[in-house]
Amino acid sequence: MRILVSNDDGVDAAGIRMLASVLREAGHEVTVVAPDRDRSGASNSLTLDLPIRLKRIDHYTVSVAGTPTDCVHLALTGLLEFEPDIVVSGINNAANLGDDVIYSGTVSAAMEGRFLGLPAVAVSLVSRNHDPKHFETAARAAVEIVARLKADPLPADTILNVNVPDLPWNEVKGFEVTRLGNRHRAEGCIAQKDPRGNEVYWIGPAGREQDSGPGTDFHAVRTGHISITPIQVDLTRYQALEKVASWVGGLSAALDQPA
């Protein structure tokens, strides 16, 4: 298969290098289009106020001065001379579980691929303290998932968010289909002062696990399983439509009132 690989940790990150290498060893034609530096947390952002510069590192690798979404968007709308069969994003060097997907550049790169018409997979290694040990396990998982998608494609609107426990392959207990869990509210920002006495702030840590019981991505990884969560671009909360329609009725009544 022709595979477009991207990430949010940057084109030189260990995870993307391992992913591209193992996919090539499996016989796939791999092209890497990835940010020139770490763009974690960039979510679905596109660069619209500046031209996007790039560097062709070799015939199969392009470094982009932009976001993960920029990378996939450019690749699929004119940068590449061919249409890939699938987009695989990763391997992220930490979890993308539950609410993490809202902020994740790794997931957003996959989402952009799906938005532009291709099957898409986001792969993350759930390491401790951002100190990943077993990228080869996550890469092996990606190879198996890509092979399965080739043999038995999923519905066209499906994005697979894959989280892999940081274990040797022979210690992984299996694959598990999950839903997204969620976290408690994020911890507070961190206030400091720069050398000139000016206020500066750092975004604080993500919240702790909240909804993380059986069936969630958190639980699967915690019990040694590879979590596969199908997600989609449509963010509509369908179960709330009837309630909100009734609520909007109260707003509509205001139109009958004199100004």
Swiss-Prot record:
GO terms for molecular function: 3'-nucleotidase activity; 5'-nucleotidase activity; exopolyphosphatase activity; metal ion binding; nucleotide binding. The gene is surE. This is 5'-nucleotidase SurE. Its cofactor is a divalent metal cation. Its main location: cytoplasm. Its EC number is 3.1.3.5. It is an enzyme of class 3 (hydrolase). A divalent metal cation binds at D8, D9, S40, N92. InterPro entries: SurE (IPR030048), SurE-like_Pase/nucleotidase (IPR002828), SurE-like_sf (IPR036523). Belongs to the SurE nucleotidase family. It is found in: Cytoplasm. Binds 1 divalent metal cation per subunit. It catalyses: a ribonucleoside 5'-phosphate + H2O = a ribonucleoside + phosphate.
